[in-house]
């Protein structure tokens, strides 16, 4: 058997043309209509006015003013000189070790 030339199919061919498809509207965005009124009933109080957020917009209740909070350090560090010196020493030691490893 040759792949470019397979043997003919032994079964019977189609006896009649396919039935015509029913005509359907074509185009993007076509969907069948849903149930009237939508799938859920409207809320008992009705819908709020459309197109705007409910709060803080055109007559809605305003947000309360923000409270400013100041954070104050409750303990003053008097050993600033020692801490600065220790930080500088650690930085120098780290740089020296790093320089030694790279060279």
From Swiss-Prot:
Keyword set for this entry? Membrane, Transmembrane, Transmembrane helix
Name of the protein? Cysteine-rich and transmembrane domain-containing protein 1
Gene Ontology CC entries for this record: membrane
Q: What is the predominant subcellular site recorded for this chain?
A: membrane
Chain positions covered by the region annotation Disordered: 1-66
Read off the lineage from the record. Answer: Eukaryota, Metazoa, Chordata, Craniata, Vertebrata
Stated family = Belongs to the CYSTM1 family.
The cross-references to InterPro entries, in alphabetical order and at most eight, read: CYSTM1-like
């Amino acid at each position: 058997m040759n792949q470019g030339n397979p043997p003919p199919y032994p079964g019977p061919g189609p006896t009649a043309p396919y039935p015509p498809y029913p005509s359907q509207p074509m185009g993007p965005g076509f969907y069948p209509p849903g149930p009237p009124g939508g799938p859920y009933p409207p809320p008992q109080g009705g819908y709020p006015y459309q197109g705007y957020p409910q709060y803080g917009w055109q007559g809605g209740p305003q947000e309360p003013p923000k409270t400013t909070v100041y954070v104050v350090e409750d303990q003053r560090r008097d050993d600033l000189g020692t801490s600065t010196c220790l930080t500088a020493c650690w930085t120098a030691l780290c740089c020296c070790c790093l320089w030694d490893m790279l060279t």
